[in-house]
Amino acid sequence: MRRFALAFAAGLLAAPAAFAADAYSLDPGHTQVRASWNHAGYSTQSLLFRQVGGDIKIDFENPSNTSLNITIPVAGIDTGVEAFDKHLASGDFFQADEFPNATFVSTSVEKTGDATLKVTGDLTIKDTTKPVTLDVVVNNSGEHPLGQFIDYYKGEWVGVTATGVITRSDWGLGFGAPITSDEVDLFISAELKKN
């Protein structure tokens, strides 16, 4: 965190020509989108979305120029229980056969601290689009230390963690609510490589 904060501060002081919105790609092996919820007061359960991708542009000098257009495949939902995965993909929830992807498109990015951002965007699930705000922590940025051993990791990288809360019934995912909580916690962890 300290290393990023120093790098971020240095970036803010650098000449404007040195920085612009650079394109980054998500590393599918180190990017996870998790959702968790309260199961009738008895436990906390979660699911994992895999193979998240999209178009990402990051501007360290002016974070408001940063943009995200993220695609989240819902057909590959993973809870660890095959029968539940199939139920979540059904018409009671994501209706994955008709709507195979959810999307998140940023509408604003605000710097809130040395290594923190508030990202607001439009989340589309099925045929419903509503705004969502994520609190983002930039864990690190710069040359990936694994680059000295593995060619894939050579170059500039950024690591982030993001959290947020949605009300699932707002997107037509309200089956079982409120016995099973309508509020769902989102947790995103990602590594991004500069193109």
PLM segments and residue spans:
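Low-complexity, acidic/polar, glycine-enriched regions of mature
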Residues: 20-195
